[in-house]
């Protein structure tokens, strides 16, 4: 989950899907657009991801028109140097358009509301009294993170339009209070794409659950393309299919361990050039995190190979000249997938640079936007599995 300052965004043209996007099925597209003004902060990014997964450990043992083909395509905004992405979603009748952080590492759908006493001035606030399709739920929700940030409010149900597909009676979480880190963020809230076992309120169906159960998509997958700033930024989420023009070669199918509510996969090894720097470890595919977070021992091996220096805050300083770097290569399933040299720098401060990888105090990795902007992923929550290919 990521929050930061927002500026202007540029719409991304909707792209035509190939026939492979969703055989015999419906799909919707949510494009991503670009914002050049946000400045990254690696230390804050590490603190957010550590807090996010500590929280789960402790609590668990835009298209505005109606889609006629059932394909949901949603564009997303790409922040400065691919740091963050968000998409637009309509909630209510008449609908209010909200900018939401799409996050496969969580499962709640929550956003600022008119009931909020301290939500950010620039945030768009959903008003339940102005929606004809809103219904009260009566239950409360609250999210607290290890860094002290939090949000809380009440539950309700309403119509949610995702890439032109209309979800009926979707449970929504209306924020009544939120921490300053959310108030000053670029988005109005968060749309969780993880499994429903980690929703804050048990038994709540996620938007993906409802897309499937309400028959809005017949192919129960969503494809994720996160554009790189060097290629114009932007990107898109496609619900009900994927866009084969966005990747090279064929998709590699990887089984998913969803026992903790996440898209967990096994990384068989990591290498830089001809040097193997790590053996097998587990990883979570998380579109809501902006820094590649590795297990401590793996991170230090990778840092050593690149001559990076530990900053003792979860980040590494690295040379700003990436032209001499070889890509960081991960073996997943029967294939290898790269994080190229130009993605190894996350943040530049004068003559010093912060690496696009860091470390955490747990034994699994968080494969974030640094990995995902270089590799196309199709998520299938029903099998469960993911399919991965190198971006075109």
Curated annotation (Swiss-Prot):
It is an enzyme of class 3 (hydrolase). Pfam families: Asp (PF00026). Residues 1-21 form the signal peptide. One of its GO terms (biological process) is proteolysis. The keyword Hydrolase applies. It catalyses: Hydrolysis of proteins with broad specificity similar to that of pepsin A, preferring hydrophobic residues at P1 and P1'. Clots milk and activates trypsinogen. Does not cleave 4-Gln-|-His-5, but does cleave 10-His-|-Leu-11 and 12-Val-|-Glu-13 in B chain of insulin. PANTHER family: ASPARTYL PROTEINASE, BETA-SITE APP-CLEAVING ENZYME, ISOFORM A-RELATED. Keywords: Aspartyl protease, Disulfide bond, Hydrolase, Protease, Signal, Zymogen. This is Rhizopuspepsin-5. Residues 85-389 form the Peptidase A1 domain. Residues 22-69 form a propeptide. The active site is at 103, 286. Belongs to the peptidase A1 family. It comes from Rhizopus niveus. Gene3D superfamilies: Acid Proteases (2.40.70.10). Its EC number is 3.4.23.21. Disulfide bonds join 116-119, 320-353. One of its GO terms (molecular function) is aspartic-type endopeptidase activity. InterPro entries: Aspartic_peptidase_A1, Aspartic_peptidase_AS, PEPTIDASE_A1, Peptidase_aspartic_dom_sf.
